[in-house]
Amino acid sequence: MEKYIMSIDQGTTSSRAILFDKEGDIKGVAQREFKQYFPKSGWVEHDANEIWTSVLAVMTEVLNENEINADQIEGIGITNQRETTVIWDKNTGRPIYHAIVWQSRQTQSICHELKEQGHEETFRNKTGLLLDPYFAGTKVKWILDNVDGAREKAENGDLLFGTIDTWLVWKLSGGEAHITDYSNASRTLMYNIYDLQWDDELLDLLNVPKQLLPEVKESSEIYAHTKDYHFFGQEVPISGIAGDQQAALFGQACFERGDVKNTYGTGGFMLMNTGEEPVKSESGLLTTIAYGLDGKVNYALEGSIFVSGSAIQWLRDGLRIINSAPQSENYATRVDSTDNVYFVPAFVGLGTPYWDSEARGAIFGLSRGTEKEHFIRATLESLCYQTRDVMEAMSKDSKIEVNNLRVDGGAVKNNFIMQFQADIVNTAVERPEIQETTALGAAYLAGLAVGFWDSKDEIANRWQLETEFTPQMSEEDRTKLYKGWKKAVEATQVFKLED
């Protein structure tokens, strides 16, 4: 009877369950989208119970559709949208407020206040992160400050906080395990990535009671077992956890210092493994934990792009100038260039290296001759320019030149984007055979803990190249195009509307 690892990939817009066999090949996939809530401009929320029911649904579906029994599952790995924050009542199991999503800007005023009080460096020096609404800490404070009775309940020990991994493990284990892993803890603004513990000073600044917080574990170990009533009568080990971007780094077998991967999902995320030494950034990158394994912690530098694949979604759903995401490649290749049109997709601000949360999207260089093909091409190119911004910062901080870029995420299927990416960064872009690297990374972490796979070496040997895109553009063109992008970003940052 063949055995499998199940990966739960809980993302920003959907939950998926993916089965991997011993070869690391995909045996089955089930996916379910869930509702996005936008209560005010710039706010993004999810219903944590909807997330939970979507996860139960895909777990059931992937087994049923592929006629696999629950006793064929050796372990479960969880990878999750990071920073998204849930607080729930531990007695009733009910969330006290919607989950506040990583993209949400509703804690802007809290961040501003902490900066005004001069605390930015304190957070930076201990967590490797910036004081930005993106991270979980200010979201926790917001919920405690804004939900009636929440603070009192938290101080009495009746509430629990978790990122989505923590919430799912708590639910799957029937409330027995309140845990997270190093990679997720490192995204909270409350965890000291050098001392590897929740930081009392930061908790005081955010006014967050310590009893709210989960226990931090390695990224690969048996944390708990599923309750049999959640998993067809089986108690299956939950044995791997990593935030989505760290899971993708692991799934891309980026185990050596200097290895880099870039994910083109809803947002864009580049991570460089910096080994067992954290690298402090002078260029607006984040210092974060890649994973904890075998008693060691590996660190990473990370660049975050807030709008990547979601810009293509916007062309489809917002402007309705394409019918499907793949169609964007067709339109973009009908013209030789953007005809000097630049699009800066700063819908929710600009991430690395600018960290300008007040910037908003802008289009430059329009003329009477601009057609939709030019604009669609400019949108696709914007993903690549933002990636170069991050890559330059990364090389500068780490003093490591990036020689090849491993890529994953929905947009990598677009050959135009991949070729333009190679051209604009002047580096080979490697698209792997298995592009579900986030889910694969979680599966690898879970599988290592239960002996399904033996070692990182075995995993590294399984990585296979599908297509390599090599630079074709002249240095002159590359320099000119990128210079235009930098001007467009600069102009975007200047344009600010008063409240």
UniProtKB/Swiss-Prot annotation:
Q: Which reaction does it catalyse?
A: glycerol + ATP = sn-glycerol 3-phosphate + ADP + H(+)
Tell me how the protein is altered or processed after translation: The phosphoenolpyruvate-dependent sugar phosphotransferase system (PTS), including enzyme I, and histidine-containing protein (HPr) are required for the phosphorylation, which leads to the activation of the enzyme.
Residues that bind glycerol: 82-83, 134, 244-245
* Pathway(s) per entry: Polyol metabolism; glycerol degradation via glycerol kinase pathway; sn-glycerol 3-phosphate from glycerol: step 1/1
Q: Which UniProt keywords apply?
A: ATP-binding, Glycerol metabolism, Kinase, Nucleotide-binding, Phosphoprotein, Transferase
User: What residues bind ATP, as annotated?
Assistant: 12-14, 266, 309, 313, 410
Q: What class of enzyme is it?
A: transferase
EC numbers on record = 2.7.1.30
Q: Which InterPro entries match?
A: ATPase_NBD, Carb_kinase_FGGY, Carb_kinase_FGGY_CS, FGGY_C, FGGY_N, Glycerol_kin
Per UniProt, ADP binds at 12, 16, 266, 309, 410, 414
The UniProt entry's GO CC annotations, sorted and at most eight, read: cytosol
- Residues that bind sn-glycerol 3-phosphate: 12, 82-83, 134, 244
Which residues are recorded as modified (Phosphohistidine)? Answer: 230
- Which PROSITE patterns does the UniProt record give? FGGY_KINASES_2
**Gene Ontology MF, one:** ATP binding
Q: How is its activity regulated?
A: Activated by phosphorylation and inhibited by fructose 1,6-bisphosphate (FBP).
Q: Which GO terms describe its biological process?
A: glycerol catabolic process; glycerol metabolic process; glycerol-3-phosphate metabolic process
HAMAP family associated with the record? Glycerol_kin
Q: What does this protein do?
A: Key enzyme in the regulation of glycerol uptake and metabolism. Catalyzes the phosphorylation of glycerol to yield sn-glycerol 3-phosphate.
Q: Which family does it belong to?
A: Belongs to the FGGY kinase family.
Q: How does it assemble?
A: Homotetramer and homodimer (in equilibrium).
Return the protein name.
Glycerol kinase
Q: Which organism is it from?
A: Staphylococcus haemolyticus (strain JCSC1435)
Lineage of the species this protein comes from:
Bacteria, Bacillati, Bacillota, Bacilli, Bacillales
